[in-house]
UniProtKB/Swiss-Prot annotation:
Cofactor: Fe cation
Family: Belongs to the iron/ascorbate-dependent oxidoreductase family.
PROSITE patterns according to UniProt: FE2OG_OXY
Residues that hold Fe cation according to the record: H241, D243, H297
UniProt-listed GO biological process terms: biosynthetic process
Species per Swiss-Prot/TrEMBL record: Arabidopsis thaliana
Any matching Pfam family: 2OG-FeII_Oxy
Protein name per the record: 1-aminocyclopropane-1-carboxylate oxidase homolog 2
Domain called Fe2OG dioxygenase: residue spans: 217-318
Single GO MF descriptor: metal ion binding
Keywords: Iron, Metal-binding, Oxidoreductase
Length: 369
């Protein structure tokens, strides 16, 4: 009688713990020479699917717009107006756009990416000393912040730090990327102020309106490392999610992988040399009462032969307890367009967002009126 093969049991909790305790992340798995990814990284076929081809009424949608910021110095009123109109349309329809001539030097962009790569490619014993899930630390290096709560892990490692309003002391940051993190975050804060002015004008408000609401007071920098994946069709670099920030400034690699979901279809975001990718976060959708939208996005697993890196800078208010509540801006609501969201503190929203983890439904749904 032919024997029946029994599939080996899968103890997910034990495998997650074993992976986490290596303290070397996905990079450690790749360095070990694996040819198949562990089951904890397997995502469902439903999540991995991408409906194609596009229906005829969406064929005109190529990808997210690219907007020229004129070196952040609009001497020409027409160019200024065009930038505002471009941002208004992109923020309302895509929630994403790329910016060129943004005032951050190409040299600094490359140095920042090199710093991320240099950190993650240090010897494992160096990285192990910094690996932690103590989210109270100034600097955190780990793999998958939601490792124990997500349905499946993502094929990436990350380090992050809050750079504003209370920047870390130099000794709090790894020497290998310290200087470039400090300089890049300063430049992103300057760019962020300019972007929030344009976004305010796009809403028909005073240029300082969003700044006065402290939308750009806090800045959190996440530096992702996506090693080559031996089975990229089974997992993600980052699973689908929207950002729980007001605004995100993303420094991408020239290895593509970012996709944005619009009307149920995933659109590739092409590499534009020297560009930064800007996207609307949940909190900006909330306070603009859906005038600007925060779309879900994801990163495909890396098919290249070298690692992909990216740097995401999230504009919040700040992480310290703050009684200030945020709801739809009063100038943007009326009897015909009543508030769609209830008021919340940033801390309450962040607690819910982080507890929910990536994937699934938008955290905004829980704050609907």
């Amino acid at each position: 009688m032919e024997s029946t093969k029994i599939a080996p049991s899968f103890d997910r909790a034990s495998e997650l713990k074993a992976f986490d305790e290596t303290k070397t992340g996905v990079k450690g798995l790749v360095d070990s020479g694996i040819s198949k990814i562990p089951r904890i990284f397997h995502h469902s076929s439903v999540e991995l699917a991408n409906p194609k081809p596009l229906p005829s009424d969406l064929l005109h949608l190529k990808t997210i717009p690219t907007i020229d910021l004129g070196g952040r110095d609009f001497q020409d009123a027409i160019k200024h107006k065009n930038a505002i109109e471009g941002i208004k349309e992109a923020a309302a329809k895509w929630g994403f756009f790329q910016v060129i001539n943004h005032g951050v030097s190409l040299e600094l962009l490359e140095k920042m990416k090199d710093g991320v790569r240099d950190f993650h490619e240090q010897p494992p014993e160096v990285r192990k000393d910094l690996y932690s899930r103590d989210f109270g630390r100034k600097f955190i290096y780990l793999s998958n912040f939601d490792l124990y709560t997500a349905a499946a892990a993502n094929w990436r490692d990350t380090f992050y730090c809050y750079m504003a309003p209370d920047p870390p002391e130099p000794q709090d940051l790894p020497e290998i990327c310290r200087d470039v993190m400090m300089e890049y975050s300063k430049q992103v804060m300057i760019l962020g102020e300019f972007l929030f002015e344009l976004l305010s004008e796009a809403l028909g408000l005073n240029p300082n309106h969003l700044k006065d609401m402290e939308c750009l007071k806090g800045l959190r920098m996440l530096c992702h490392y996506f090693p080559p994946c031996p089975e990229p069709d089974l997992t993600f670099g980052t699973s689908k999610h929207s950002d729980g920030s007001f605004l995100t400034v993303l420094l991408p690699d020239n290895i593509e992988g970012l996709q944005v979901c619009r009307e149920g279809y995933w659109f590739d975001v092409p590499h534009v040399p020297g560009a930064l990718i800007i996207n609307i976060g949940d909190l900006l959708q909330l306070i603009t009462n859906d005038k600007f939208i925060s779309l879900k996005h994801r990163v495909l697993a890396n098919r290249a032969t070298r690692a992909r890196v990216s740097v995401a800078c999230f504009f919040h208010t700040h992480v310290k307890p703050n009684p200030r509540v945020y709801g739809p801006i009063k100038e943007l609501v009326s009897e015909e367009n009543p508030p769609k969201y209830r008021e919340t503190t940033i801390r309450d929203y962040a607690t819910y967002f982080n507890g929910k983890g990536l994937g699934g439904t938008s955290a905004l749904l829980d704050f609907k009126v």
